Amino acid sequence: MDEKEYRLKVKDVYARLERSFEGVDPDVAEVETGLGTLAILSGRSKTILSTQPSVRQIWLAVAALGVAVHFDWDASRQAWIDDKGTGKELFAYLQETLRQLCPGLGEFRLG
């Protein structure tokens, strides 16, 4: 994937996440974006997605869990998949992580 395609795919991920949080009470969780990052802030933690254009990855860091996961685009699955071979998809992983960290989200679903 070239850099232009990478940036479009990242832009889509960030837009989907921002839309997902539009109806969420900001006292429960909110999203902030800037300079290639997207931060999900909740009472207990900060979850950060960052772009890594040189390696065409999205990196996810979850401070409260001490976790960092790198995701590559998998064209055959049309999804961002972790680079350690476990098959974790970015949105599914993030959904599971947010449920652990922010019980106030209830049945919240990522778009």
Give each language-model segment a name:
Residues M1-G111:
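N-terminal intrinsically disordered, cationic/polar leader segments
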